[in-house]
Protein backbone atom coordinates (compact mmCIF):
# COMPACT_ATOMS: atom_id res chain seq x y z
CA UNK A 1 0.00 0.00 0.00
CA UNK A 2 1.36 3.42 -0.96
CA UNK A 3 2.04 5.80 1.92
CA UNK A 4 1.76 9.56 1.41
CA UNK A 5 4.96 11.60 1.69
CA UNK A 6 3.49 13.43 4.71
CA UNK A 7 2.95 10.18 6.64
CA UNK A 8 6.31 8.86 5.46
CA UNK A 9 7.89 11.95 7.01
CA UNK A 10 6.63 10.95 10.46
CA UNK A 11 9.55 8.52 10.69
CA UNK A 12 11.48 11.42 12.20
CA UNK A 13 10.66 14.38 14.42
CA UNK A 14 10.33 17.70 12.57
CA UNK A 15 9.88 20.70 14.90
CA UNK A 16 6.35 22.19 14.75
CA UNK A 17 5.18 19.80 12.02
CA UNK A 18 1.40 19.29 12.13
CA UNK A 19 -0.78 17.01 10.05
CA UNK A 20 -4.16 15.34 10.34
CA UNK A 21 -5.81 12.50 8.46
CA UNK A 22 -8.78 10.13 8.57
CA UNK A 23 -8.25 6.56 9.72
CA UNK A 24 -10.59 3.55 9.92
CA UNK A 25 -12.24 3.59 13.35
CA UNK A 26 -10.49 0.90 15.46
CA UNK A 27 -13.26 1.10 18.08
CA UNK A 28 -16.16 0.34 15.74
CA UNK A 29 -18.22 -2.58 17.02
CA UNK A 30 -16.16 -3.01 20.18
CA UNK A 31 -17.19 -2.54 23.80
CA UNK A 32 -14.22 -0.21 24.26
CA UNK A 33 -15.71 2.34 21.84
CA UNK A 34 -15.58 5.66 23.73
CA UNK A 35 -17.76 7.39 21.10
CA UNK A 36 -20.88 5.22 20.92
CA UNK A 37 -22.67 4.83 17.60
CA UNK A 38 -21.47 8.02 15.92
CA UNK A 39 -24.41 10.26 16.83
CA UNK A 40 -24.28 13.32 19.10
CA UNK A 41 -20.53 13.74 19.03
CA UNK A 42 -19.57 10.13 18.39
CA UNK A 43 -17.25 8.69 15.76
CA UNK A 44 -18.48 6.89 12.65
CA UNK A 45 -16.55 4.59 10.36
CA UNK A 46 -13.47 6.81 10.54
CA UNK A 47 -11.73 8.82 13.21
CA UNK A 48 -9.62 11.97 12.86
CA UNK A 49 -5.98 11.54 13.80
CA UNK A 50 -3.83 14.66 14.32
CA UNK A 51 -0.08 14.60 14.93
CA UNK A 52 2.03 17.50 16.20
CA UNK A 53 5.78 17.60 16.84
CA UNK A 54 7.09 19.90 19.54
CA UNK A 55 8.83 23.14 18.51
CA UNK A 56 11.38 22.46 21.26
CA UNK A 57 14.60 20.52 20.59
CA UNK A 58 13.98 16.77 20.74
CA UNK A 59 16.07 14.41 22.90
CA UNK A 60 18.11 11.60 21.35
CA UNK A 61 15.16 9.23 21.76
CA UNK A 62 12.01 11.36 21.45
CA UNK A 63 8.89 10.15 23.24
CA UNK A 64 5.38 10.02 21.80
CA UNK A 65 2.07 10.27 23.69
CA UNK A 66 -1.56 10.16 22.62
CA UNK A 67 -4.85 11.56 23.84
CA UNK A 68 -8.46 10.60 23.16
CA UNK A 69 -10.60 13.62 22.35
CA UNK A 70 -13.56 13.78 24.71
CA UNK A 71 -16.89 12.71 23.21
CA UNK A 72 -18.83 15.72 21.94
CA UNK A 73 -15.84 18.09 22.19
CA UNK A 74 -14.12 17.08 18.95
CA UNK A 75 -15.05 20.43 17.38
CA UNK A 76 -13.81 22.38 20.39
CA UNK A 77 -10.84 24.44 19.21
CA UNK A 78 -8.73 22.98 22.02
CA UNK A 79 -8.75 19.66 20.14
CA UNK A 80 -9.48 20.65 16.54
CA UNK A 81 -6.87 23.37 15.88
CA UNK A 82 -3.11 23.44 15.70
CA UNK A 83 -3.00 26.18 18.35
CA UNK A 84 -4.99 24.09 20.82
CA UNK A 85 -2.97 20.98 20.01
CA UNK A 86 0.24 22.93 20.64
CA UNK A 87 -0.93 24.05 24.07
CA UNK A 88 -1.75 20.45 25.00
CA UNK A 89 1.65 19.27 23.75
CA UNK A 90 3.61 21.96 25.59
CA UNK A 91 1.86 21.02 28.84
CA UNK A 92 3.59 17.61 28.60
CA UNK A 93 7.21 16.47 28.33
CA UNK A 94 6.73 14.59 25.07
CA UNK A 95 8.14 15.40 21.65
CA UNK A 96 5.09 14.24 19.71
CA UNK A 97 1.41 14.24 20.64
CA UNK A 98 -1.24 12.28 18.74
CA UNK A 99 -4.91 13.25 19.12
CA UNK A 100 -7.58 10.73 18.12
CA UNK A 101 -11.30 11.48 18.03
CA UNK A 102 -14.40 11.86 15.85
CA UNK A 103 -14.02 13.58 12.50
CA UNK A 104 -14.81 17.29 12.54
CA UNK A 105 -17.83 16.70 10.29
CA UNK A 106 -19.51 14.67 13.06
CA UNK A 107 -22.21 16.73 14.83
CA UNK A 108 -21.97 17.91 18.44
CA UNK A 109 -24.96 18.12 20.80
CA UNK A 110 -26.22 21.66 21.69
CA UNK A 111 -25.25 21.09 25.33
CA UNK A 112 -22.16 18.92 25.67
CA UNK A 113 -21.74 16.81 28.82
CA UNK A 114 -18.10 17.06 29.86
CA UNK A 115 -17.78 15.08 33.08
CA UNK A 116 -17.66 11.55 31.62
CA UNK A 117 -14.19 10.14 30.90
CA UNK A 118 -13.67 6.95 28.87
CA UNK A 119 -11.78 4.01 30.37
CA UNK A 120 -8.33 4.47 28.80
CA UNK A 121 -7.13 0.85 29.12
CA UNK A 122 -9.28 -0.96 26.51
CA UNK A 123 -9.20 2.09 24.22
CA UNK A 124 -5.41 2.13 24.45
CA UNK A 125 -5.21 -1.50 23.36
CA UNK A 126 -7.32 -0.82 20.26
CA UNK A 127 -5.23 2.23 19.33
CA UNK A 128 -1.79 0.80 20.08
CA UNK A 129 -0.94 -0.53 16.57
CA UNK A 130 -1.69 2.90 15.09
CA UNK A 131 0.24 4.70 17.81
CA UNK A 132 3.32 2.54 17.34
CA UNK A 133 3.18 3.21 13.60
CA UNK A 134 3.21 6.94 14.37
CA UNK A 135 6.35 6.78 16.52
CA UNK A 136 9.61 8.02 14.98
CA UNK A 137 11.97 5.26 13.85
CA UNK A 138 14.63 6.20 16.38
CA UNK A 139 12.25 5.14 19.18
CA UNK A 140 12.71 1.53 18.03
CA UNK A 141 16.50 1.64 18.36
CA UNK A 142 18.10 -1.63 19.58
CA UNK A 143 14.81 -3.48 18.92
CA UNK A 144 13.06 -1.55 21.68
CA UNK A 145 9.27 -1.19 21.61
CA UNK A 146 8.40 2.34 22.74
CA UNK A 147 5.74 3.05 25.32
CA UNK A 148 3.03 5.38 24.04
CA UNK A 149 0.92 6.45 27.04
CA UNK A 150 -2.68 7.55 26.60
CA UNK A 151 -2.98 10.90 28.35
CA UNK A 152 -6.23 12.19 29.83
CA UNK A 153 -7.55 15.74 29.44
CA UNK A 154 -9.07 17.23 32.59
CA UNK A 155 -10.78 20.55 33.16
CA UNK A 156 -13.48 21.70 35.57
CA UNK A 157 -16.37 21.69 33.07
CA UNK A 158 -19.57 19.72 33.65
CA UNK A 159 -21.52 21.15 30.70
CA UNK A 160 -20.61 23.30 27.71
CA UNK A 161 -23.11 25.10 25.46
CA UNK A 162 -21.85 27.31 22.61
CA UNK A 163 -23.98 30.48 22.40
CA UNK A 164 -22.57 32.32 19.40
CA UNK A 165 -19.65 32.19 16.98
CA UNK A 166 -18.50 35.52 15.52
CA UNK A 167 -15.46 36.78 13.62
CA UNK A 168 -13.59 40.00 14.29
CA UNK A 169 -11.19 41.77 11.92
CA UNK A 170 -8.31 41.63 14.43
CA UNK A 171 -8.75 38.57 16.67
CA UNK A 172 -10.47 36.37 14.07
CA UNK A 173 -13.01 33.74 15.10
CA UNK A 174 -14.31 33.73 18.67
CA UNK A 175 -16.96 31.85 20.60
CA UNK A 176 -19.29 32.88 23.40
CA UNK A 177 -20.21 29.82 25.46
CA UNK A 178 -22.13 29.06 28.64
CA UNK A 179 -20.53 26.47 30.89
CA UNK A 180 -21.29 24.68 34.13
CA UNK A 181 -18.23 24.60 36.39
CA UNK A 182 -17.60 21.89 38.97
CA UNK A 183 -17.42 23.80 42.27
CA UNK A 184 -17.46 20.75 44.55
CA UNK A 185 -18.21 20.46 47.39
CA UNK A 186 -20.55 23.33 46.52
CA UNK A 187 -23.18 23.44 43.79
CA UNK A 188 -22.12 23.77 40.13
CA UNK A 189 -21.58 27.36 39.01
CA UNK A 190 -22.73 28.70 35.66
CA UNK A 191 -20.48 31.07 33.75
CA UNK A 192 -20.31 32.73 30.36
CA UNK A 193 -16.93 32.64 28.63
CA UNK A 194 -15.25 34.19 25.62
CA UNK A 195 -12.48 32.34 23.77
CA UNK A 196 -10.54 33.13 20.60
CA UNK A 197 -9.76 30.44 18.04
CA UNK A 198 -6.14 31.57 17.76
CA UNK A 199 -5.64 30.84 21.49
CA UNK A 200 -8.41 28.38 22.36
CA UNK A 201 -6.98 27.27 25.70
CA UNK A 202 -7.01 30.82 27.06
CA UNK A 203 -10.34 32.05 28.45
CA UNK A 204 -10.39 35.72 27.49
CA UNK A 205 -13.32 36.61 29.75
CA UNK A 206 -15.71 34.81 32.04
CA UNK A 207 -18.54 36.06 34.21
CA UNK A 208 -21.04 34.36 36.47
CA UNK A 209 -24.53 33.72 35.13
CA UNK A 210 -27.79 34.13 37.00
CA UNK A 211 -31.39 33.52 36.04
CA UNK A 212 -33.51 36.37 34.74
CA UNK A 213 -35.89 37.49 37.52
CA UNK A 214 -38.97 36.56 35.45
CA UNK A 215 -37.59 33.09 34.73
CA UNK A 216 -36.67 32.50 38.36
CA UNK A 217 -40.13 33.59 39.52
CA UNK A 218 -41.89 31.39 36.96
CA UNK A 219 -39.97 28.28 38.00
CA UNK A 220 -38.56 28.75 41.46
CA UNK A 221 -37.67 25.08 41.72
CA UNK A 222 -35.53 24.99 38.57
CA UNK A 223 -31.78 24.95 39.01
CA UNK A 224 -29.20 26.88 37.04
CA UNK A 225 -28.12 23.59 35.48
CA UNK A 226 -31.67 23.09 34.20
CA UNK A 227 -31.64 26.65 32.85
CA UNK A 228 -28.48 25.84 30.90
CA UNK A 229 -30.04 22.66 29.51
CA UNK A 230 -33.19 24.57 28.54
CA UNK A 231 -32.22 27.88 26.94
CA UNK A 232 -29.57 30.52 27.34
CA UNK A 233 -32.40 33.06 27.07
CA UNK A 234 -33.20 32.43 30.75
CA UNK A 235 -29.71 33.43 31.83
CA UNK A 236 -27.93 36.78 32.14
CA UNK A 237 -24.43 37.86 33.21
CA UNK A 238 -24.03 38.84 36.85
CA UNK A 239 -22.46 42.27 36.34
CA UNK A 240 -20.67 44.29 38.99
CA UNK A 241 -20.04 41.41 41.39
CA UNK A 242 -16.73 39.87 42.38
CA UNK A 243 -14.31 38.97 39.62
CA UNK A 244 -14.31 35.31 38.56
CA UNK A 245 -10.81 34.96 37.16
CA UNK A 246 -8.02 34.86 39.76
CA UNK A 247 -5.56 36.77 37.58
CA UNK A 248 -8.02 39.69 37.32
CA UNK A 249 -8.43 39.65 41.10
CA UNK A 250 -4.64 39.83 41.35
CA UNK A 251 -4.49 42.74 38.88
CA UNK A 252 -7.01 44.68 40.97
CA UNK A 253 -5.03 43.79 44.10
CA UNK A 254 -2.07 45.64 42.60
CA UNK A 255 -3.89 48.90 43.30
CA UNK A 256 -3.25 48.30 47.02
CA UNK A 257 0.29 49.57 46.47
CA UNK A 258 -1.08 53.10 45.95
CA UNK A 259 -4.12 52.79 48.26
CA UNK A 260 -3.31 55.91 50.36
CA UNK A 261 -3.07 58.08 47.24
CA UNK A 262 -6.35 56.73 45.85
CA UNK A 263 -8.06 57.13 49.24
CA UNK A 264 -6.97 60.78 49.37
CA UNK A 265 -8.20 61.39 45.82
CA UNK A 266 -11.62 59.88 46.52
CA UNK A 267 -12.00 61.85 49.77
CA UNK A 268 -11.30 65.06 47.85
CA UNK A 269 -14.11 64.23 45.41
CA UNK A 270 -11.83 63.38 42.47
CA UNK A 271 -12.33 60.01 40.81
CA UNK A 272 -9.05 58.19 40.13
CA UNK A 273 -8.49 57.51 36.43
CA UNK A 274 -7.55 54.12 34.99
CA UNK A 275 -6.56 53.13 31.47
CA UNK A 276 -7.41 49.49 30.71
CA UNK A 277 -5.33 48.24 27.78
CA UNK A 278 -7.44 45.33 26.59
CA UNK A 279 -11.16 45.12 27.36
CA UNK A 280 -12.26 41.63 26.32
CA UNK A 281 -15.69 41.01 27.81
CA UNK A 282 -15.34 44.04 30.06
CA UNK A 283 -15.07 42.34 33.48
CA UNK A 284 -12.06 44.35 34.63
CA UNK A 285 -13.17 47.87 33.58
CA UNK A 286 -16.73 47.24 34.83
CA UNK A 287 -15.50 46.08 38.25
CA UNK A 288 -13.13 49.02 38.64
CA UNK A 289 -15.80 51.49 37.60
CA UNK A 290 -18.64 50.01 39.70
CA UNK A 291 -16.78 48.55 42.67
CA UNK A 292 -13.99 51.11 43.11
CA UNK A 293 -15.60 54.27 41.67
CA UNK A 294 -12.86 54.88 39.09
CA UNK A 295 -13.15 56.85 35.89
CA UNK A 296 -12.18 54.21 33.32
CA UNK A 297 -11.00 54.38 29.72
CA UNK A 298 -10.86 50.99 27.98
CA UNK A 299 -9.03 50.34 24.70
CA UNK A 300 -9.77 47.23 22.64
CA UNK A 301 -8.20 46.38 19.28
CA UNK A 302 -11.28 44.70 17.80
CA UNK A 303 -14.67 46.41 17.63
CA UNK A 304 -16.45 43.06 17.32
CA UNK A 305 -15.05 42.08 20.73
CA UNK A 306 -16.66 45.22 22.19
CA UNK A 307 -19.97 44.33 20.53
CA UNK A 308 -19.76 40.88 22.13
CA UNK A 309 -18.97 42.47 25.50
CA UNK A 310 -22.03 44.72 25.26
CA UNK A 311 -24.42 42.06 23.97
CA UNK A 312 -23.32 39.03 25.99
CA UNK A 313 -21.27 40.12 29.01
CA UNK A 314 -23.11 43.15 30.36
CA UNK A 315 -20.62 45.89 29.43
CA UNK A 316 -22.39 49.24 29.90
CA UNK A 317 -20.74 52.54 29.01
CA UNK A 318 -21.59 55.73 30.89
CA UNK A 319 -19.98 59.03 31.84
CA UNK A 320 -17.38 57.21 33.96
CA UNK A 321 -16.66 54.29 31.62
CA UNK A 322 -15.68 54.83 28.00
CA UNK A 323 -14.30 52.29 25.56
CA UNK A 324 -12.52 52.90 22.27
CA UNK A 325 -11.45 50.72 19.37
CA UNK A 326 -7.73 50.99 18.69
CA UNK A 327 -4.22 49.82 19.40
CA UNK A 328 -3.73 50.23 23.16
CA UNK A 329 0.06 50.39 22.93
CA UNK A 330 -0.15 53.04 20.21
CA UNK A 331 -2.62 55.01 22.34
CA UNK A 332 -0.25 54.94 25.31
CA UNK A 333 2.52 56.32 23.09
CA UNK A 334 0.19 58.97 21.62
CA UNK A 335 -0.90 60.14 25.09
CA UNK A 336 2.73 60.36 26.22
CA UNK A 337 3.67 62.57 23.27
CA UNK A 338 0.85 65.01 24.01
CA UNK A 339 1.95 65.48 27.64
CA UNK A 340 -1.45 66.92 28.56
CA UNK A 341 -1.98 67.25 32.35
CA UNK A 342 -5.59 66.06 32.14
CA UNK A 343 -4.46 62.84 30.43
CA UNK A 344 -2.68 61.54 33.54
CA UNK A 345 -3.84 58.25 35.06
CA UNK A 346 -3.61 56.74 38.52
CA UNK A 347 -3.24 53.30 36.95
CA UNK A 348 -2.54 51.74 33.58
CA UNK A 349 -3.66 48.10 33.59
CA UNK A 350 -2.40 45.94 30.72
CA UNK A 351 -4.25 42.72 29.91
CA UNK A 352 -2.99 41.97 26.40
CA UNK A 353 -1.84 38.62 25.04
CA UNK A 354 0.54 37.83 22.21
CA UNK A 355 -1.00 37.76 18.75
CA UNK A 356 1.30 34.89 17.73
CA UNK A 357 -0.60 31.67 18.43
CA UNK A 358 2.45 29.58 17.57
CA UNK A 359 4.19 31.00 20.64
CA UNK A 360 1.45 29.28 22.66
CA UNK A 361 -0.23 31.47 25.28
CA UNK A 362 1.91 34.39 26.43
CA UNK A 363 1.36 37.92 27.73
CA UNK A 364 2.00 40.78 27.35
CA UNK A 365 3.00 41.06 23.67
CA UNK A 366 6.67 41.72 23.02
CA UNK A 367 5.92 45.27 21.79
CA UNK A 368 4.66 46.17 25.27
CA UNK A 369 7.92 45.37 27.04
CA UNK A 370 10.15 47.63 24.96
CA UNK A 371 11.79 50.25 27.15
CA UNK A 372 10.33 53.09 25.06
CA UNK A 373 6.77 51.81 25.52
CA UNK A 374 7.22 51.32 29.27
CA UNK A 375 8.67 54.83 29.49
CA UNK A 376 5.61 56.14 27.63
CA UNK A 377 3.37 54.34 30.13
CA UNK A 378 5.27 55.96 32.99
CA UNK A 379 4.87 59.38 31.34
CA UNK A 380 1.05 59.19 31.35
CA UNK A 381 0.89 58.13 35.01
CA UNK A 382 0.69 60.67 37.81
CA UNK A 383 3.42 60.82 40.46
CA UNK A 384 1.71 58.19 42.62
CA UNK A 385 0.64 56.06 39.66
CA UNK A 386 1.16 52.37 38.88
CA UNK A 387 1.54 50.20 35.81
CA UNK A 388 -0.09 46.78 36.36
CA UNK A 389 0.74 43.97 33.93
CA UNK A 390 -0.78 40.52 33.51
CA UNK A 391 2.17 38.29 32.59
CA UNK A 392 2.10 34.77 31.15
CA UNK A 393 5.70 33.77 30.39
CA UNK A 394 5.92 31.73 27.16
CA UNK A 395 6.75 28.07 27.94
CA UNK A 396 9.57 27.96 25.40
CA UNK A 397 11.39 31.08 26.66
CA UNK A 398 12.64 30.93 30.23
CA UNK A 399 14.39 34.31 29.93
CA UNK A 400 11.22 36.28 29.08
CA UNK A 401 10.10 36.91 32.66
CA UNK A 402 13.54 37.87 33.98
CA UNK A 403 14.04 40.23 31.04
CA UNK A 404 10.71 41.93 31.73
CA UNK A 405 11.51 42.33 35.42
CA UNK A 406 14.91 43.83 34.57
CA UNK A 407 13.52 46.43 32.15
CA UNK A 408 10.75 47.41 34.58
CA UNK A 409 13.38 48.00 37.27
CA UNK A 410 15.20 50.32 34.85
CA UNK A 411 12.11 52.43 34.11
CA UNK A 412 10.13 52.46 37.38
CA UNK A 413 10.96 53.20 41.02
CA UNK A 414 9.66 50.01 42.64
CA UNK A 415 8.31 46.66 41.47
CA UNK A 416 5.87 44.28 43.14
CA UNK A 417 4.83 40.75 42.18
CA UNK A 418 1.82 38.51 42.75
CA UNK A 419 2.06 34.84 41.83
CA UNK A 420 -1.53 33.97 40.86
CA UNK A 421 -0.84 30.35 41.76
CA UNK A 422 -2.25 28.71 38.64
CA UNK A 423 1.12 27.85 37.14
CA UNK A 424 0.70 30.48 34.39
CA UNK A 425 -0.08 34.03 35.48
CA UNK A 426 1.99 36.56 37.37
CA UNK A 427 0.93 40.15 38.01
CA UNK A 428 3.63 42.83 38.11
CA UNK A 429 2.93 46.25 39.61
CA UNK A 430 5.45 49.02 38.88
CA UNK A 431 5.32 52.37 40.68
CA UNK A 432 6.38 55.77 39.37
CA UNK A 433 7.60 56.89 42.82
CA UNK A 434 8.89 55.07 45.92
CA UNK A 435 6.06 54.07 48.23
CA UNK A 436 6.07 55.80 51.59
CA UNK A 437 3.56 53.56 53.39
CA UNK A 438 3.61 49.89 54.27
CA UNK A 439 1.36 47.34 52.58
CA UNK A 440 0.52 46.13 56.08
CA UNK A 441 -1.62 49.27 56.60
CA UNK A 442 -5.16 47.89 56.17
CA UNK A 443 -7.14 51.01 57.06
CA UNK A 444 -9.36 53.01 54.74
CA UNK A 445 -12.60 52.66 52.84
CA UNK A 446 -10.82 52.04 49.52
CA UNK A 447 -8.94 48.99 50.82
CA UNK A 448 -12.18 47.62 52.25
CA UNK A 449 -13.84 47.82 48.83
CA UNK A 450 -10.70 46.55 47.11
CA UNK A 451 -10.73 43.37 49.20
CA UNK A 452 -14.24 42.59 47.97
CA UNK A 453 -12.88 42.39 44.41
CA UNK A 454 -9.37 41.09 45.03
CA UNK A 455 -10.02 38.36 47.57
CA UNK A 456 -6.91 37.37 49.51
CA UNK A 457 -4.45 38.44 46.83
CA UNK A 458 -3.56 41.55 48.85
CA UNK A 459 -1.75 39.19 51.23
CA UNK A 460 0.40 37.83 48.37
CA UNK A 461 1.93 41.10 47.14
CA UNK A 462 5.70 41.09 47.51
CA UNK A 463 8.33 43.58 46.49
CA UNK A 464 10.98 42.25 44.10
Q: What name fits each language-model region?
A:
Residues 2-29, 42-47, 51-165, 169-171, ...:
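The AdoMet/dcAdoMet-binding core of the Class I SAM-like
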Residues 78-79, 185-186, 202-206, 438:
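Short, solvent-exposed loop/turn elements at domain surfaces
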Residues 177-186, 418-420:
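Short beta-strand micro-motifs enriched in acidic
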Residues 182, 200-202, 302, 433-436:
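Short loop/turn segments at secondary-structure transitions that flank enzyme active sites
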Residues 193-234, 409, 440-455:
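Aromatic/acidic cage segments in peptide-binding pockets
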Residues 406, 410-464:
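Core SAM-dependent methyltransferase catalytic element
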Amino acid sequence: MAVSPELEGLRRIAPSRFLSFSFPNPFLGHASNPYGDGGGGGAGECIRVAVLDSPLPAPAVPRTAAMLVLAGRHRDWIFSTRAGHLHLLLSTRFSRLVLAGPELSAPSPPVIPCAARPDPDPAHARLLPLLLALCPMVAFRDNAVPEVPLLTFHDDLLRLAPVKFVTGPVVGEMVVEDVAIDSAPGSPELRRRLRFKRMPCLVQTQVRLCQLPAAAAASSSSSLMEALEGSGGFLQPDVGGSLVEPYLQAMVAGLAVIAPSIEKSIQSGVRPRCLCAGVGGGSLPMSIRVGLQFNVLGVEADGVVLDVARNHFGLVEDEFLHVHVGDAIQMIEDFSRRREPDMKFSAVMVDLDSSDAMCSVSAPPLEMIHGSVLLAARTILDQQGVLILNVIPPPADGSFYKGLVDVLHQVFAELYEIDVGNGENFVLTATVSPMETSLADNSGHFLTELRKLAGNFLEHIRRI
